[in-house]
Amino acid sequence: MASKGSPSCRLVFCLLISAAVLRPGLGWYTVNSAYGDTIVMPCRLDVPQNLMFGKWKYEKPDGSPVFIAFRSSTKKSVQYDDVPEYKDRLSLSENYTLSINNAKISDEKRFVCMLVTEDNVFEAPTLVKVFKQPSKPEIVNRAAFLETEQLKKLGDCISRDSYPDGNITWYRNGKVLQPVDGEVSILFKKEIDPGTQLYTMTSSLEYKTTKSDIQMPFTCSVTYYGPSGQKTIYSEQAIFDIYYPTEQVTIQVLPPKNAIKEGDNITLQCLGNGNPPPEEFMFYLPGQAEGIRSSNTYTLTDVRRNATGDYKCSLIDQRNMAASTTITVHYLDLSLNPSGEVTKQIGDTLPVSCTISASRNATVVWMKDNIRLRSSPSFSSLHYQDAGNYVCETALQEVEGLKKRESLTLIVEGKPQIKMTKKTDPSGLSKTIICHVEGFPKPAIQWTITGSGSVINQTEESPYINGRYYSKIIISPEENVTLTCTAENQLERTVNSLNVSAISIPEHDEADDISDENREKVNDQAKLIVGIVVGLLLAALVAGVVYWLYMKKSKTASKHVNKDLGNMEENKKLEENNHKTEA
């Protein structure tokens, strides 16, 4: 016969059965929390009228419970179980909401809220999920450079402290990189910190670059799950130096090759379009089969015209990859014959030649006493006015600074030549006597009166121009006198005399010499007259030819008319004879 148990035993038994079996119908409830935040878990149960107390527990992986918090409905007191990982982290409110501060990865568990009455136990499970945003990904262990046609490690993309773990993606210019055999290789790995349970993700990229990757940005991203869903964080851009071989060689000349002249320094610069550019080249000079090894520049100093020719440079290890250029060293030679100081006698012949030798057509300018001449000088018979400083100057317009000049200082000497003239003043009270002197060096003039032999100092002289000048005196002689003019220079002493009648005796005046300026005017007038006469003669000749052609044509026409008239007369006579015969 079975005995009946006590009421307390019966209650404990019912509670155990309820805790183990009775799980009223609330479904799973999930609370998402960020790492380090406070986890708040409502009980989600209606508080019954006869509530004795409330408890929170979590379940171990094997299903065994661990109680962590207790609150009595009557004493309003809270008790926390001695669980080391939750010490000083728990808070249980009056409505049995459990809060856990400083959320950790280890808090990812199934927590259960239990409300206990005298005859029942009510439970509401809550699943806690903890998320940790990973650090911003960064590209580390970057390659110093990438080489074309070589599969080489570009770098590692690393993102730390993530929970749960995330995925890393590589991008080239914003487009996703996918593994391609021999061209793109991606190796992903993740590690978990035993203490924090946080993940570190690393993705290594090996990449075969091309020249199209120059200045192309590479990035990576990490995609992870957070409390609000999936998110992505991008790294900073990384741009890599792309190494590629030289495909073309160019050669430059400094200064520009169209302006090189003798005496200049020439620098040849050879460039390759590879990266990095070649540092050394072979330079080949005109007429030299062997090259000269140098850096990317080679300098020739004080070049001469024989440096004109073809210059070439090439890569050290690829002689067929070369470039060439033609250099012309411009030159300009000038030879003036005669040059320097030349002394000639008046009337002499002096041929002058200015010979130019240049790398291209040069301009030639003649100057006399700083005045430009229209043509080069030529002296078939030297005059005093031909004396002066002559300069032959030549230049190459295309080449700055290339000009030459030579000078000729021409001295025309002559013995003194004298001509004396006299002229009576219209008033008849005085006479002007002029001594015209020509010669070089400038002759000195002296006047004397025959008889007395006295020297006359009261004279007036003209300027000495082109080897000529004159000296004049004005006298009023009471009797006939003879005036003597003496001209002397380093070459000779010349004397001339002139008889002058007394003022009371009329005499014929002698005309003055024509000055150089007047002589030129006379020559110009003579040329003009000759031109007019020649023009008139040509006009008369043309008129004569036209008249002759006209007369010839007129005579021909007259013959034709007379012939026609004769034929008409003959026809008339024939008609008359015919009439007579019929009668």
From Swiss-Prot:
It is found in: Cell membrane; Cell projection, Axon; Cell projection, Dendrite. Residues 562-583 are annotated as: Disordered. The chain crosses the membrane at residues 528-549. Residues 28-120, 125-234 form the Ig-like V-type domain. InterPro entries: CD80_C2-set, Ig-like_dom, Ig-like_dom_sf, Ig-like_fold, Ig_sub, Surface_Rcpt/Adhesion_Mol. It comes from the Eukaryota. Strongest expression in the lung, then brain, liver, and kidney. Present in the somatosensory system, basal ganglia, cortex, olfactory system, and circumventricular organs. Its main location: membrane. Keywords: Adaptive immunity, Cell adhesion, Cell membrane, Cell projection, Disulfide bond, Glycoprotein, Immunity, Immunoglobulin domain, Membrane, Repeat, Signal, Transmembrane, Transmembrane helix. Residues 28-527 are extracellular. GO terms for molecular function: identical protein binding. Residues 245-328, 333-409, 416-501 form the Ig-like C2-type domain. PROSITE patterns: IG_LIKE. This is CD166 antigen. It comes from Rattus norvegicus. The lineage of its organism: Eukaryota, Metazoa, Chordata, Craniata, Vertebrata. The gene is Alcam.
